[in-house]
A protein has these predicted regions:
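Transmembrane and membrane-interface helices of multi-pass
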Residues: 1-252
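Active-site-proximal alpha/beta segments of enzymes that process anionic O-linked groups
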Residues: 198, 230-463, 558-559, 564-585
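Metal-dependent active-site segment of extracytoplasmic phospho-/sulfohydrolases and closely related
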Residues: 296, 481-520, 563, 567
Length: 614
């Protein structure tokens, strides 16, 4: 008896190990740019999934159900584990630097377990075969298989997975548009075959679910199965509580929910934006440049001033052009030495930096005016060029702001060659700008965003080894590459667009020596650069603004006040600008003691050693 039990235990241990290694292998081989700590995190995440699946098999065998009758549930689970991850990898392996899908794998494992637990549970309750249960489970299995099937059909047609953009198009379509799309792209025969195929699959699964109730259940009283009944109930409730969150994180649902969030935010933003824009009163300066001119704002990504040689970083010359420009021409290149981000991630930081909303007024984003609005009202033609991902639903507020520009363009949209894009690919966009107009240009770079190894061309490697992953040297190389990009932007704009002012700041900082954290963000991740170039003509035309900015180079500042600073640099007076928040104004009210960061949870004054790299 003991020998038999040991054999059974070995069988389940092998099954557990097989499922666990399968999930880890799928994640590992279909991921790109995944740091080791994320892999370790998923080792922990998939452990309970494998335990649940093993318990499902154990209880199925314990009650002598035929093993072949569990195959429909296995097929459903495996479809979720494999489909999205493999298709996403095939679609983006040559163009993406970060593929990190893990929810589909966990969802597949949990769905398999839950289906098995539920079937055993219901047979423990009714103790007899049931056509209704066969039908219900066959229908549920078919519904669950629809998601991987739709992804397979979509991939076979478009050679990519369902993106947020595709989901937005779907949610915006009315029934007639959807009908026309299906008829045009699939045709009546295709629609008929798909419906017929799904119907046949459902009938097949219903038949496969049909089984006889084993004697262990049909002839046993409730008391004998009481313990198993309670264990199954706990397992079913536990998985059911977590499963909706897991489902929301799967590839197809992440795209759909992201699209819904975007459309909801867009609806709110559009509802108030026109009204707010109409009410915006702007009084531009009476002093005019001698000919049409350009102001440029470059938004950096994850650029920490502690790692910039322009701010004293000595390990390597990571920003040689900025450093030399400031050293040789400090009257035109102004370096602000005590600037912080309002938060350690892009969306929360920039939705404040680019609008009236800040840490101190906590204004609703959807009711806030933007830097684009200010520039438009002041008579500038507005441009937004971005190397950020347009598929990134986390950047929804930023995309909403960007799309209000006269010209908004994401270079990802024009990536016909399916290659990795670098910030240097933004440079041709400047040639689209008309030099005979007053222009306000925003360039949103990828900067030093994870994974930094892919933020610069291999031939640009200066401090590391070509193609070798190293957090610190890759981060330094990404900083050096963007320093070169800034130089090219500056040179082209000064020679061709009558550049009068150029502002560079970052959404937040980073620390390549430490993994990124979402909570209790350390100060090093909040310390950012702010560098402003002013032309000779600008300084002669606006001497007061120039002198105030020079005086404020050692003033403390947070980037959620960039909206007012841009308004000040554009020489705008408005009913939607507060001079007390404007670093270019003598009225600027904030000091080291009053400024906050981390969305108001931290005081800047508590950063006792700004130069320390923790």
């Amino acid at each position: 008896m003991k020998k038999y039990a040991l054999k059974i235990n070995k069988k389940y241990f092998i099954f557990f190990l097989s499922i666990y290694l399968l999930m880890l292998s799928v994640f590992f081989f279909t991921s790109i740019g995944t740091e080791s700590y994320r892999f370790l995190l998923n080792m922990r995440r998939y452990f309970p999934v494998a335990v649940a699946a093993t318990l499902a098999l154990f209880y199925w065998n314990y009650y002598d159900f035929p093993v072949k009758k569990i195959l429909p549930d296995c097929f459903v689970g495996l479809s979720w584990i494999f489909t999205h991850n493999i298709l996403d990898y095939l679609a983006y392996r040559n163009v993406s630097t970060n593929i990190n899908n893990f929810f589909d794998i966990a969802f597949g494992g949990y769905v398999f377990s839950l289906l098995v637990f539920l079937r055993i549970f219901w047979y423990l309750v009714i103790k007899r075969p049931s056509k209704l249960i066969d039908f219900i489970f066959g229908f549920i299995q078919t519904a669950l298989l629809l998601f991987p099937l739709i992804e397979l059909v979509y991939f076979s047609y478009y050679h990519t997975t369902i993106s947020t953009a595709a989901s937005i198009a779907f949610l915006q379509s009315n029934p007639n548009e959807m009908k026309e799309y299906l008829l045009q792209n699939i045709g009546v025969l295709g629609i008929f075959c798909f419906i017929a195929g799904i119907s046949m699959l459902c009938i097949f699964l219903i038949k496969k679910n049909k089984l006889e109730v084993p004697a262990k259940i049909s002839s046993a009283g409730f008391r004998k199965n009481k313990r198993t009944f309670l264990v199954l109930l706990v397992l079913i409730i536990s998985i059911s509580v977590y499963l909706p969150k897991c489902f929301a994180g799967t590839g197809i649902m992440h795209s759909m929910l992201g699209a819904k969030q975007y459309l909801d935010n867009a609806k709110k933003f559009e509802k108030y934006h026109k009204e707010n824009f109409d009410q915006l009163q702007v009084i531009p300066s009476t002093n005019k440049f001698s000919k049409p001119s350009t102001v440029i704002l470059v938004i950096g990504e994850s650029a920490g001033r502690n790692f910039m040689s322009a701010y004293g970083y000595s390990a390597n010359d990571t920003t040689p052009w900025l450093r030399k420009s400031i050293e040789k021409d400090s009257t035109h290149f102004l370096r602000f030495n005590h600037v912080y981000s309002s938060y350690g991630s892009t969306m929360q930081s920039l939705e404040r930096a680019l609008t009236e909303k800040n840490q101190y007024n906590n204004k609703d984003f959807s009711r806030s005016l933007t830097i684009i609005d200010l520039a438009k009202k002041a008579g500038y033609k507005t441009y937004w060029f971005s190397n950020q991902s347009v598929k990134n639903t986390a950047d929804t507020p930023i995309q909403l702001i960007a799309r209000t520009a006269d010209v908004a363009y994401w270079i990802e949209d024009g990536n016909e060659n399916n290659r990795i894009l670098y910030d240097g690919d933004l440079l041709p966009c400047l040639k689209k700008v008309n030099a005979n107009e007053n222009n306000f240009i925003v360039l949103h770079v990828m900067g030093s965003h994870e994974l930094t190894l892919h933020r610069f061309p291999p031939e640009f490697t200066r401090f590391g080894t070509v193609g070798v992953f190293d957090l610190v040297s890759n981060y330094e190389d990404s900083m050096a590459y963007d320093d070169w990009v800034l130089q090219q932007i500056f040179s082209y704009a000064r020679e061709n667009l009558n550049l009068q002012a150029m502002v560079f700041f970052s959404d937040h900082g980073a620390n390549p020596y430490r993994k990124r954290v979402a909570d209790n963000i350390p100060f090093i991740n909040l310390r950012i650069p702010l560098i402003i170039y002013l032309s000779d003509e600008y300084e002669q035309l606006y001497p007061q603004t120039t002198s105030v900015l020079i005086e404020h180079e050692n003033q403390y500042f947070t980037n959620d006040l960039m909206y007012e600073l841009i308004g000040g640099i554009l020489q705008i007076k408005s009913n939607h600008l507060d001079e007390k928040n404007d670093l270019s104004s003598k009225e600027f009210q904030f000091t080291r003691d009053t400024l906050k960061t981390d969305l108001g949870r931290k005081n800047i004054k508590d950063d006792y050693n700004e130069n320390k790299i923790e």
